Amino acid sequence: MHDKILILDFGSQVTQLIARRVREAHVYCEIHPNDVSDAFVREFAPKAIILSGSHASTYEDHQLRAPQAVWDLGVPVLGICYGMQTMAVQLGGKVEWSDHREFGYAEMRAHGHTELLKDIEDFRTPEGHGMLKVWMSHGDKVTGLPPGFKLMASTPSCPIAGMADETRHYYAVQFHPEVTHTVKGRQMLERFVLQIAGCKPDWVMRDHIEEAVAKIREQVGDEEVILGLSGGVDSSVAAALIHRAIGDQLTCVFVDHGLLRQDEGKLVMEMFVGRLHAKVVHVDASEQFLGHLAGVTDPEQKRKIIGREFVEVFQAEARKLTNAKWLAQGTIYPDVVESGGTKTKKATTIKSHHNVGGLPETLGLKLLEPLRDLFKDEVRELGVELGLPPEMVYRHPFPGPGLGVRILGEVKRDYADLLRRADAIFIEELRKTIATEHDAAAGLCEPEQVGKSWYDLTSQAFAVFLPVKSVGVMGDGRTYDYVVALRAVQTTDFMTAHWAHLPYALLGRCSNRIINEVRGLNRVVYDVSGKPPATIEWE
């Protein structure tokens, strides 16, 4: 049985990052709403509890409180931002509204050599004080310590930026250790989880495979399972895991909507039929999808049409498999949290996935989601352990609607063909171009990244078709052809992203090859927008 951390979510946009940092320490954790019952907290039996941040005000909103069981269990508790404030209020301290709100980078002084912060510092002042570079995001602040607590940290704007009751192993910080902007944040969370809470770092994928396989066999028995295979990481890993558990009881349906990447259908069939010997039904529905997309320019309408048509095609194939009793999906933990699947009232539905919808209810099937407890990086690790090739497991993310949302405006087959070829050239050049010492000296990459491909050094890269024409010259003739934009970003969590500073020589090769090899395109531009203000995808 694994040690578990319970994360109570008060509505922060970055609660998932807390869970990711805990999982990176190889400790299992789950996110649940702050208003779970005392009985739930006791039955969960956590080794420790973490209270998240929130957009709410402790001073004004008396409803967002941690269950009493949090304080009765006798386990270590870490409060983060709002979590610190509710800890203070519930344990007899004082919180006040501040006329000096603090958002962004801050330098914080550690006090008292607490177990949480001892020997963790970014630099020292001339007076010898240990300082930390942290990320603040709060309006209210603690102005009075609860009984038994001592000061742990402070900033000029926030005299009580951290507090601790080391007898009860209660710690609280006003900053966000889970975000990358807090330089030593990961180290702090690891210390809380591994040393203060005493969790064993035994959450590893090899063990998880055995547990997941056993659970799938127990759930499914001798019944059959159908899975929509997209070629993306999540559905591919789910298919490989389920196939390992039940073999030919699984049938995969691969729908080609005409908006896939270059040779994607071929690669999927080679992998799952050729190497894993799985049963795969390949449906070419490109005419159906493209026909319904004709004349549609609104991005959200395009997504809805693609989602609707996918459901229709998948339903038609599923009904042919009369023995199927289960629908498998590659749902991962962020999907569960974002869709409110953790039953938290605080979670806002951010997106709906085009291949989920109401399929299980419509088809009368039971739902099998073997990846629903895993983050994306854990899914990739699982895929490698299952024997999937790294080039498939570590492919950049690809949207469910495919090229349909990378073609601005109306989707046409000719546009998709042009974009597919341009995108393939861009990805090929990224894969074969290796970062050099010159790149590191120019500040384009870190010294330790020298020798890696630029594909591996970017988090997501793709081409976008722009439905505008520009004048060009090729040979002795004038051209009037379409424009393609290249987009490459670097990010740790996809919540924020920087545009990738690719070498000019690499961009030049991409431009030359695209213009010379893809007839119909005569201009290539590079997107230098970060997120925010832009999103990663254009639509």
Curated annotation (Swiss-Prot):
Signal sequence interval, chain numbering: none
Catalytic residues identified in the record: C81, H176, E178
Residue span(s) of domain GMPS ATP-PPase: 203-395
UniProt domain Glutamine amidotransferase type-1: residue ranges: 4-202
Tagged with keyword tRNA processing: no
Class of enzymatic activity (EC top level): ligase
Residues annotated for ATP binding in this entry: S230, G231, G232, V233, D234, S235, S236
GO molecular function: ATP binding; GMP synthase activity
GO terms under cellular component: cytosol
Pfam families: GATase, GMP_synt_C, NAD_synthase
Record's subunit section: Homodimer.
Protein name per UniProt: GMP synthase [glutamine-hydrolyzing]
Species this protein is from: Cupriavidus taiwanensis (strain DSM 17343 / BCRC 17206 / CCUG 44338 / CIP 107171 / LMG 19424 / R1) (Ralstonia taiwanensis (strain LMG 19424))
Lineage summary: Bacteria, Pseudomonadati, Pseudomonadota, Betaproteobacteria, Burkholderiales
